[in-house]
A protein has these predicted regions:
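Conserved beta-strand hairpin/beta-sheet module of binuclear metal-dependent hydrolase folds
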Residues: 1-44, 124-141, 158
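Structured catalytic core of nucleotide-sugar glycosyltransferases
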Residues: 6-17, 57-67, 72, 85-86, ...
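A short helix->loop->beta-strand "cap" motif at the edges of active sites that frequently abuts
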Residues: 24, 74-77, 204-210
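Active-site neighborhood of phospho(di)ester-bond hydrolases with catalytic His/Asp-centered motifs
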Residues: 28-31, 51-59, 79-82, 137-141, ...
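Active-site metal-binding motif and surrounding structural segment of the metallo-beta-lactamase
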Residues: 35-80, 157
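Metallo-beta-lactamase
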Residues: 80-133
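Active-site glycine- and acidic-residue-rich loops that bind
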Residues: 138-150
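Cap/insert and terminal regions of metallo-dependent hydrolase folds
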Residues: 147-211
Length: 211
């Protein structure tokens, strides 16, 4: 039994990743409408009622806008930190709140570790899934990488990480300067070069796939 990662969608229109381990199925982020999630899961021959839980990285709409409807319509447990739960107006009686660097266990040997990452206006985390000696990570929407993140992702067999823009194209583009500064700042997103530098610090012979 191993961990598998399937990206149901990424980008400003919505993000969600299906993580499977044996009979367990967990989503990282749910930035889609209920109807759209049903459609994307159907491609995997799955229904929302088969999902064991949804982990939310942060409250921005493209990552968490579908959490409340998933909670209400299908009763899927939502796992997030306090700030994210408040921003998404989740039912706290049905929401599992976590603290960074405290493992979230879905089975005896299948867990997720939330690792804090910098992102503007959000209490954002990356997630490291583990099963036995196997580990896989999802890190999105971070303006810079930290040594703490390097420590937890080094040697992961699978890494999903953003590479959001080319610096030259960004600064030569037509965006307002203020927006360019926000995108490239510590609270924005990783550039292609930053992601490359990060990966040079975490990839080992054990790493099998990078998305």
């Amino acid at each position: 039994m191993s961990i598998s990662f399937t990206h149901l969608g990424t980008g400003s229109r919505g993000n969600s990743t299906l993580v499977e381990c044996g009979d367990h199925k967990v989503l990282v982020d749910q930035g889609f409408s209920g109807k759209e999630l049903e459609k994307r899961l159907a491609r995997m021959e799955l229904k929302p009622t088969e999902i064991d839980g949804i982990l939310i990285t942060h409250h921005h709409g493209d990552h968490g806008s579908g959490a409340a409807i998933s909670q209400k319509r299908w009763g899927i447990p939502i796992f997030c930190n306090d700030r994210t739960a408040s921003a998404l107006n989740l039912d706290l009686s049905k929401t599992h709140l976590f603290e960074s660097l405290e493992a979230i266990e879905f089975a005896e040997d299948f867990a997720f570790l939330p690792v804090p990452v910098p992102h503007s206006g959000a209490d954002n985390v990356a997630f490291v899934a583990s099963h036995g000696g196997e580990r896989g990570a999802i890190a999105t929407d971070l303006g810079s990488w930290t040594e703490e993140l390097v420590t937890h992702l080094r040697g992961c067999q699978h890494i999903s990480i953003e590479a959001n823009y080319d610096q030259k194209r960004l600064w030569n583009g037509k965006y307002p300067v203020r927006l360019k500064e926000r995108i490239s700042g510590r609270g924005g997103h990783l550039s292609n070069d930053q992601t490359g530098a990060f990966l040079s610090n975490v990839v080992t012979p054990e790493t099998r796939s990078i998305v």
